[in-house]
């Protein structure tokens, strides 16, 4: 909820959590908790605090064999006032779709782009997206889709906010 000037009234996050062997069960069976400012989740003597807020857009990719994959990843608010945010998602093809590991790696997808909770378009042809309000009044995305080696299985940690530019420069990822 937001005030008329765009200031958030309260920050909350509905989370599910598990510990011990419960992490191997279905997430629907995990404990639920509404995380709020100054009301941390307490687990095994630790406290998990809500540090900020933003959006995690949901994307679904349908592969040529009809299988689909859905991901929801937190995007980084680049504009703290109107929450224009950036992020990236990486998708591995469904198991069994490509028997050769090299071919499968070449068919990974990466989506990188912007999310605007209240999209506003400007520019000569209306092709520049920004956000004019922090609440989701007219959500929009501007994305680039890449195919190739998204680095999913190279053993290195990756940013959830941007692609490794070396993958595109080397030709491993192509728009």
Over which residues does each language-model region extend?
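Solvent-exposed, non-transmembrane regions of integral membrane proteins
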Residues: 1-175
């Amino acid at each position: 909820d937001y005030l008329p000037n765009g200031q958030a009234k309260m920050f909350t996050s509905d989370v599910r959590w598990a510990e011990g062997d419960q992490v191997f069960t279905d997430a629907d069976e995990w404990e639920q908790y509404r995380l709020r400012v100054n009301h941390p989740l307490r687990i095994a003597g630790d406290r998990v605090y809500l540090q900020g807020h933003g959006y995690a857009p949901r994307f679904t990719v349908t592969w040529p064999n009809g299988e689909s994959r859905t991901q929801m990843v937190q995007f980084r608010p680049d504009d703290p006032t109107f929450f224009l945010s950036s992020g990236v998602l990486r998708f591995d093809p469904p198991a069994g779709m490509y028997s050769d590991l090299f071919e499968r790696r070449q068919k990974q997808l990466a989506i990188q782009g912007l999310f605007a909770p209240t999209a506003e378009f400007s520019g000569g042809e209306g092709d520049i997206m920004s956000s004019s309000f922090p609440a989701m009044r007219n959500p929009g995305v501007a994305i680039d889709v890449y195919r190739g080696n998204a680095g999913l299985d190279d053993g290195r940690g990756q940013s959830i906010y941007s692609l490794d530019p070396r993958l595109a420069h080397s030709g491993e990822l192509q728009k």
